[in-house]
Regions:
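The canonical Cys-X-X-Cys-His
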Residues: 60-63
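Conserved Radical SAM active-site core
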Residues: 29-31, 37-40, 47, 52, ...
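Flexible, acidic/Gly-rich N-terminal and inter-domain linker regions that tether
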Residues: 1-54, 58
Length: 133
């Protein structure tokens, strides 16, 4: 069993290197300051954006919606693109786009799909999305 898992991991690494090379990049959301001997975050390098502002229907115990208050709000697709343009000009390399959850646990990102594509294609930002729980 362990040998089988090791073989799968080795194969996955081989495929990864063939497609992406040996460099591994790590991104840390900017809402928390990180400083280690290997990495120090900056507030504008990889900001977090909420498409719901401070709204969250679930208010889960782990966050209670408080994390949303650390995020930049972008409530419309146009606001999202303009915010990302500004962030790019300020030196951002990417962003995390998320927001509060709806009652079913999803983050309402559907109407932002086209704007997210434009952010990637036109601005060249690395974009991560958190789609819900």
């Amino acid at each position: 069993m362990a040998d089988e898992k090791l073989l799968k991991m080795e194969e996955a690494r081989k495929v990864s290197v063939e497609n992406f090379g040996k460099i591994i990049r790590f991104y840390a959301p900017s809402f928390t300051y990180y400083k280690t001997s290997f990495y120090s975050s900056t507030p504008s390098a990889f900001p977090t954006i909420s498409v719901t502002g401070s709204y969250c229907a679930l208010k889960c115990e782990h966050c209670n919606g408080i994390v949303l208050n650390t995020m930049l709000p972008a409530l419309t697709p146009a606001e999202l693109f303009r915010l990302c343009e500004k962030l790019k000009m300020e030196g951002a390399v990417g962003c995390l786009i998320s927001g509060g959850c709806m009652p079913d646990g999803s983050v309402p990102l559907g109407r932002f799909a086209e704007a997210i594509g434009l952010v990637k294609r036109e601005l060249g930002l690395t974009v991560f999305v958190h789609t819900g729980i």
